[in-house]
Amino acid sequence: MEIPLSRYQSIRLDEIRDSSSNPKVLTFPRKFSLRGRRWKNPFGRLSCSSVVQGLKPKPKLKPEPIRIEVKESKDQILDDTQISKSGVTICSQIEKLVLCNRFREAFELFEILEIRCSFKVGVSTYDALVEACIRLKSIRCVKRVYGFMMSNGFEPEQYMMNRILLMHVKCGMIIDARRLFDEIPERNLYSYYSIISGFVNFGNYVEAFELFKMMWEELSDCETHTFAVMLRASAGLGSIYVGKQLHVCALKLGVVDNTFVSCGLIDMYSKCGDIEDARCAFECMPEKTTVAWNNVIAGYALHGYSEEALCLLYDMRDSGVSIDQFTLSIMIRISTKLAKLELTKQAHASLIRNGFESEIVANTALVDFYSKWGRVDTARYVFDKLPRKNIISWNALMGGYANHGRGTDAVKLFEKMIAANVAPNHVTFLAVLSACAYSGLSEQGWEIFLSMSEVHGIKPRAMHYACMIELLGRDGLLDEAIAFIRRAPLKTTVNMWAALLNACRMQENLELGRVVAEKLYGMGPEKLGNYVVMYNMYNSMGKTAEAAGVLETLESKGLSMMPACTWVEVGDQTHSFLSGDRFDSYNETVKRQIYQKVDELMEEISEYGYSEEEQHLLPDVDEKEEERVGRYHSEKLAIAYGLVNTPEWNPLQITQNHRICKNCHKVVEFISLVTGREMVVRDASRFHHFKEGKCSCGGYW
């Protein structure tokens, strides 16, 4: 019998009808015999919707033949007019389609096999269909293929049993995979590797170790890839004790020099916090691969050894080992920690030079860096160039808009993400709600907050409530903010009360601020930032005695306020400044130049209407010290140095380790107006973009 293949090439199974016949539902047996052992079907009763609904081929006016170019094979694939429409031909076409990575077209032909159950299908065709399921990661396809195998009485050999097991693992059907694994009569190392790697990938590390123990008892052997997977499980558990036991086993079996095992050891020790042993495992490798370099560099960066990680990165470059997108993403993360914009520009150039401009991992790291370091427009450019975007990419850019006070852009990006059918998560809502809070977008903020549970089925967490409290505080609705905290259907957290305390500071509500501060002090652990907010509140309102009391409390608790420090990057060098004249690393000529520039700026902005506010320091500070420290805050010194040493057309960016004080915020607004320079200040709270005398924060931070 001949089957018109061209009719089915682009027709979905559910679109095929036949009004002349209406066959009954086909049911497949739950078990079939396999070498004397029963192979259980985890899916039970399966049916084909086309058989249920009947069959009716839908002809096409201009059928297009299948044309496939296979370089590896000299056999030509013939069109519909040249081939005999037999089951063997269909199977051959399916195998060649899979070989050419045309998996969906292969399943369109597979529908014909499902309809004509009389066709005999060989092992190679089943193997091709399994490969298509793995590549598509489609649970529906897995059920169809596995059900078809059972209905045709297919009895797989060990190779195909392992392939079927791998198909279930790769498609996320881990429970069914375990059931199939238990039914395999003769399990080998590959069987164990497939199921163990599946449980590790799903984060079920305890089950993975149980299977590893079972494998050792049954086979008394272990494959090197399985060792590497188990080291990853140890890292997931955070158990260096278990990891060291695996290390000893690898030494006894003589597989410790294997590349996969060595890289697994480096990764395990790094993630468990033992960076010295990670470095030792790295140095013991006979041949250091790109993955090994990436693992050890990432380990140093993960534990805060950014300078050492950067040195290793240069060593990797000098060793001649090729870099990949993961190397560049690590390089960008190190740049973020060290605030080195020039280093990131080098990484960006390397991405383009090495052909990684479309790779999602490194480019998402770029979006994150540019967002965090004041280059949000550049971040958007990189984001738009990405051919594929994951949820991390969307969240990184949205968070960048939030930190830079561009709430409207963040909301538009959120709407665009929803329109693109990308499901938001908790981080997404935190980013967009923070953007609304920073920009004072009350209406949009409340609409998005309510949509979390009502539309997207995501229960708001404490951090989302903190954003809404900040939004209420920005509008001066402090009583409503307290009521909102009390009505929250979850345990109140430090972040929620801290948002209210900051609102009290900005609204200068000292009485409520004291109450909230006492609440925070009793919640523990002690958080220095809350004391700093109270200190600033007292200080800005002239309550010097109360401010001194806050410092005494800090001292009694063993806490201390770090001195205000500001950094500015000029070229590839980072320059730091403390308030007053405490920057001994500069010679007297540079110091005089900086002071002179500050004095000139203060004089210029005074002509534009700026008047110096009275500075309130502690009672034991004399007037001269008060005047000197107040006039030469670290922000002003850094700006003066940057203005002198950078081109006029470049935006000036500085970084502060505290919240920028009210007076300095006002000064920078006037300086941006007088000099015509765009200035970006990153303080402990957020980014402040100063342009033409205005700040992106709108006076609320």
UniProtKB/Swiss-Prot annotation:
Q: Which GO terms describe its molecular function?
A: RNA binding; zinc ion binding
Q: Name the InterPro entries on file.
A: DYW_dom, E_motif, Pentatricopeptide_rpt, PPR_At4g14850-like_plant, TPR-like_helical_dom_sf
* Chain residue ranges for the region called Type E(+) motif: 572-606
Sorted alphabetically, which keywords does the UniProt record give?
Answer: Chloroplast, Plastid, Repeat, Transit peptide
Q: Provide the GO biological process annotations.
A: RNA modification
Task: Provide the transit peptide span.
Answer: 1-47
PPR repeat start-end pairs: 86-116, 122-156, 157-187, 188-218, 223-257, 258-288, 289-323, 324-358, 359-389, 390-424, 425-460, 461-491
Q: Where in the cell is it found?
A: Plastid, Chloroplast
**Keyword Plastid appears in the UniProt entry:** yes
- Per the record's keyword annotation, is Cell wall biogenesis/degradation included, yes or no? no
Q: Assign the protein's first listed, main location to one coarse class.
A: plastid
Q: Where is this region: Type E motif?
A: 496-571
Q: Which GO terms describe its cellular component?
A: chloroplast
- Region of interest: Type DYW motif: 607-701
What family does the Swiss-Prot or TrEMBL record give for this protein?
Belongs to the PPR family. PCMP-H subfamily.
Protein name per its UniProtKB record: Pentatricopeptide repeat-containing protein At5g50390, chloroplastic
The opening ranks of the lineage are: Eukaryota, Viridiplantae, Streptophyta, Embryophyta, Tracheophyta
